[in-house]
């Protein structure tokens, strides 16, 4: 007979170990909980967080695959499994995962639908299927027209092809409006002006991008 307090104590102890930076010991505790009580979603989530933090891709795949069986209505496991496959360059597996995930996301969860379509767009772009990539980005923006990652990526990819530059400029402008201090989005905006031959605005925004880039050495 299982004592629920055993898993509760292990959960608390595991969380304490995480706070102390003892990730291996914490991982061991959470793994024990998932074996004692496979339906303990919180323990699986902690395990997944540790695997993501340490970029242990095979472990992310193991956890997400098992959690898909245990929690078939939880789209987050499809999301991270897709990312893991993408990291391994298993693009078809990633696509299949996101498309399966879309099936279980309620229509009302427009933000998550948008994120999944954004990921699908990124995969198609990676395998150089531009029409499908742009179709997926359009779907993403249909669900959430303020999906800033999609707005930026879509705008940037269009500008690289020198295609639909006015649309690219509009999307990039919105990304910058939503996150005015994001150097990546400012850089994209500058690049689009540069491609269009508007060097004055390109210079203004590239300087702004550099001023906001905290990664550069002083």
What are these regions (language model features)?
Residues 19, 53-54, 87, 119, ...:
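Register position in tetratricopeptide repeats
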